[in-house]
Amino acid sequence: MSSLSDWENTKENIVPLKTGRDPTKLALFAKQTNQSDEELEKEKQKFEIIINEYQGEDPIDNWLKYIKWVQQSYPGGNMKEQLIVLLERCTRLFLSTEKYKNDPRYLRIWITYADMCRDPIEVFSFLEVQRIGFYLSLLYEARAIVYENKGNYEQADKSFKQGIERKAQPIERLQQKHLDFERRLIARLKHQQQHQQLQQQQQQQNDQLEQQQLDENGNTKLTRSALGTISSSSVHSERKSQQTKGLPLGNSTIDKKRKVGNDQKNNLGFQIFDDEKGGSTTNEVLTDSKFFGSSRKAAALMAAGQTQQTSQMKWDELEPELNKHKENTQLSQKWSDVKLLQKKQKITTAGFQIYCDQDSLSNNNNGSNNNNNNNNNENIPLSPDKLRVHSSKQQSKLEQIQNNPLANFPKVSTSNSSSSSSSSTNKSTSTTTVTTTKNERVGYNKPLFTKENEKHEISFEEYRASLFKKKLIEKQEQQNKKIEKEKEELDIKLKQEQKEQKEKEQKEKEQKEKEELEIKLKQEQQEKELQYQQHQQKQYQQKQQQQQSYNPPSPTMTIHTKQAFHDVMAMFSEPLEFEKNNKSTSSSSSLQLNNVPSSPNPFTESTLMKSTIDNNKNDNNNNNNNNNNNNNNKNTDVSFDEKSIEDQENIDPNQGGGGGNNDGNPLLSSKITNRDVLMKQLFSKDEDEGNQFDQERDMVKTIERIDLLVKGKDTPKFEIFEDSTLASSQLHSKSVSLADKVASKNKQLNPLEQSQNPLKKSILGSSGINGINGNNGGFTIFQDQPNQEKKQPLQQSQLQNPLKNSILGISDANGNGGGGGSGSGSGGFTIFQDQAAEEKKPFNEKEQQQQEEKEKENKIEEEEEEEEKDKEKEINYQNITGNITSTIDPTTVIICSLTPDDGIVNPYLIDHQYLLEQHVSATVQSIQSFFNVGDDLAPLPEQLDQCEPNQLFEDNSIIVQWPFSDITVNFTKCVCKSTMDGSMTFKVERIDDLAMTTSEDSWLSCKVQDPPSIWEFYIGNQIHQRLQERSLTISNSKFPTIHSLYYYTDKSIMLMDHTIDQGTLDDVVSSTNGVPMEEPLAMFHCIELLKMIEDLHLVGIIHGNICANNLHFLFGQTSDWPDWTAGECKGAWKSKGFTLTDFSRSIDTTIYSQDARYQSPIELLPIGTPLEWLKINQSSTTNVGWSYNLDYLGICKVMFHILTCGKEELKLSLSQQTGKLEIINQSIIQKDSFSELDTLWLPFLTTLLNHNGENGNQQTTTTTYILKQQRNLFENYLQSNPVKSKIKSLLRIQNIKLFESMKSKQ
């Protein structure tokens, strides 16, 4: 600011602000010039431009800056004119914006606007109706302050209480303000009481003073007033001069009271003068107190006629007052007893204004000119109506807004009465009426016949013409507006089309880029998969070579597949004792598994033989050099090098002679037979005797010489024998659980490390391993006879435990059994291995006798042990995945148990799934609807591998006929593709003749799995079989029927019921369009789901992937459909509910021990599994794994999906206080739709989420009991509330909505 004097001169015109003012703005205000005004206008225009061009999400921010700028830039009185208009614009602009109705910034603008108006209460009532600031404490606080300032403390208190009841925020501030208001109210009441007491005390003091001023006779002492006359001492008169009529100086309340008392005394009657009395000797006359100044008491005595005279007057000395002012004197009397007649007054109304011409006005004015006439016309008084209009026009905007702040706002319902009253007053003022005594009323609407800019009236015809012109103008304007609107709409449409085209182009580009990226990613994934497969194959070959060369596989595996045969062959990987050469050739003729020649064996794999042949080529070249050197020496002894043994099958026994010259060619050497090897190594006979055996015996193959050694030698390395105790203990083994025996055996044995067998891609060969029928019960494991006969189904008791059948040698009618049992039914067998034999020394009779004695002693000990074991009548089982001891009983039956010693299983690993399929392969092969086509490729076109979900195929474009059956199908649509195992599901139609003649549904679902798998087919058949055994026919219909499975080398194809077109539970939820499902209907779906999972757990199956997409809706029948009752399933209710599909991740708990637990990484678990649930069920100290509670989690996810209309997935957190799982996002469930949320739904979800599913051996019964208990809670609630149990009508409505939504999707 320039100087202090400038500030002193202008500070009185500055309006103070609570926030203070900017000194720079004040400096500009001190020096107001034209430039400063122009700068203010420029800044104002900038703000207007910013507000108009703003396109952000918070436009009120610019208005707040604009308002603050006006308050700072206009510090004088003109701020109100600028500010109130700006506030009105801002409040009117955001009136219909919902997000600002409870914004404190917008509410402060309204309060500032109300503060500048003359009646803020009207503004607050408007805010109440519009619900602006409804939940903000500032509204109630400001309204209470207004009422308090007006003295309406009751309304102020109500305003505070109303805000507290509505829980306006911040509630603490509002409560504190209410307490402050109560304190002020109490203080104000105390102050008023004190003030009243002071007034009473002052009044009492005044009364005492007045009494003190009375004399002894009761008269007040006369006090001299200013400019008054002094009465004589002889005359007691109150007459004063006329100057005393004005108020005397120093007038007090005592003088007023005395004056009032005197007036009351003057009301006494007037005594008439009596001449007789006046002529008496005393010459005294009693007069009225008004003239003689007697007191009230004396006047009363005189009126009563008492003889006592207090005041006297001598007429000779003073003229009486009556004679002096006789005409102006009026007797005083009581006005209440007098009726005054008044004249009738005419009702004055606004007269009819007569129109006056200018000529007549000019004639009336004297000495008027034309200019004077014009000036006089302006001074003509206007009518009352025009005065009102004129006065309203002269009002400024500030006054107009202050008087009517809501004039430009929409009217609300609360102001209807006021608006109606105002309109009626306007009508009355706009029309001038003239009334007569006869109550006649003549109306005349003068503004209709007067133009706005002119003062003369118009005729009726002119008025009609003006109305017609207005209508024409309005029509033209409307037409012009329509044309403009059409143009604008066309422009908008064109712009939208251009935008849509651009968006389409961008989307197409993005889709192309996405497709290219997806193709690249697929290619990269395929390359990685190929690399991974190649890497696995290499590792597999390396492991196989290492195991075969160094660590022969355990001889404790049960032989019932081709894989077992290869494992047994691996036992003979090292050269036999008699195959070792003499000292001269022993170093160069060692035989290993990698050098085994490629013999025509049907059990060997082509891929494995190719690798071994390639490896043998280099070794054979090296061995040939050694063989040539040995042959050049012309030694008569037979050379058992590797090359000679490898080429034995290609040598003709008739060619060549023993010890003949071969001319350095090793291929011309004589045929080496099994007999030559035995005689040379064991009995050290010469070459002639070996040649005799060559002539007597046929040539043998490499495998046959091993068999010959096993049969002919007394002390073999490996022995295969039959156990006669198995046949007697077969019945006993059926009654005892297989897993319990394995567990009891594992506890007795000491663990040692044992490696597992390598995996193979195909677990089913083209034919099984069949036993050789014979009378003596002997057999060989090296034969594989083709089985072309039809498979016969096994008996029910044999299907229950396929592993036991394979071990105990139970065979079907064709001799197909577990592990190659003989057709005579002589029992199972065991492979065991003795200790490695020492190297052979030269033959000695003493040593031979010692060996025979030792063998006899060993046989006696073994017989005693066998007798003791027969008395126990139990068979010990050994787990192939577990560990074995160094000493194994040769009569022990060793089986493949899939439960480790610690009882924790990872069921989703590839290795474990391969063992599972091996385990159930015998059961699957016995099913009639299973077709093993393992030697062929799947007859599916490549087009199916490249299709996408929901892709339709042309009619009859893909037709496939399945082998071993007359079924022919037509592929019509690709339904879905699984993200878990990569399987694809298609919709197919049967077009064969059998489907046309039968009444069965021709539509089926075809599931293609790559790599092939039999697990889902096994689970589906086991569910139906076990439910049928338990007579659960109703639940049996809730699971899909699997018609057949075709097992190829590259894929497995499964045909089953088609339920996808009926819709899933996800489709049911989405058909409601975001509206929550009716609570009774949600309870019905929950009851059906719990019942279905309860029966599934009862038969020992864990589904493992319960979700909304795997629950397919059943429309069911409509005939014989009674009302729903709890615990009953009659009529059409049997076909209602859902069908559970996708058993690829299911677990058969009967295969494992009863106390087995399961663990798996989160990548292999179902999608959406919460990490907190996995932590508490796998990594905690109490729960080392999960079991049936995996399905509990699926049930909770499905029901949460229903309760939230599919908006969010289930989110969990671990409570630190209770250590239990809690639902984080339960607040999104609408309590209005689900009234039993706190009493039923949330306890139900938390109970299942925190249940671990284990209770020792009673696990299955415990899980079913928990599900049944929760199901009974919902059934009891619906049964106790019959109004809410009208499920039938609700289900009909849901069926219609789902049918319409599914039809629209198709």
UniProtKB/Swiss-Prot annotation:
Biased composition (Basic and acidic residues): 837-859
Disordered: annotated segments: 229-262, 363-439, 528-558, 579-670, 747-875
Start-end of Polar residues biased regions: 392-406, 603-613, 747-759
Lineage: Eukaryota, Amoebozoa, Evosea, Eumycetozoa, Dictyostelia
InterPro entries: Bub1/Mad3 (IPR015661), Kinase-like_dom_sf (IPR011009), Mad3/Bub1_I (IPR013212)
Record protein name field: Probable inactive serine/threonine-protein kinase bub1
Presence of the UniProt keyword Coiled coil in the record: yes
Coiled coil: 187-218, 467-544, 843-881
Annotated Gene Ontology cellular component terms: kinetochore; nucleus; protein-containing complex
Compositional bias (Low complexity): 363-379, 411-437, 531-548, 583-602, 614-635, 762-773, 793-806
Keyword entries, A-Z: Coiled coil
Residue ranges constituting the Protein kinase domain according to the UniProt record: 953-1298
Similarity comment: Belongs to the protein kinase superfamily. Ser/Thr protein kinase family. BUB1 subfamily.
BP GO terms, sorted: meiotic sister chromatid cohesion, centromeric; mitotic spindle assembly checkpoint signaling
SUPFAM superfamilies registered for this protein in UniProt: Protein kinase-like (PK-like)
Biased composition (Acidic residues): 860-869
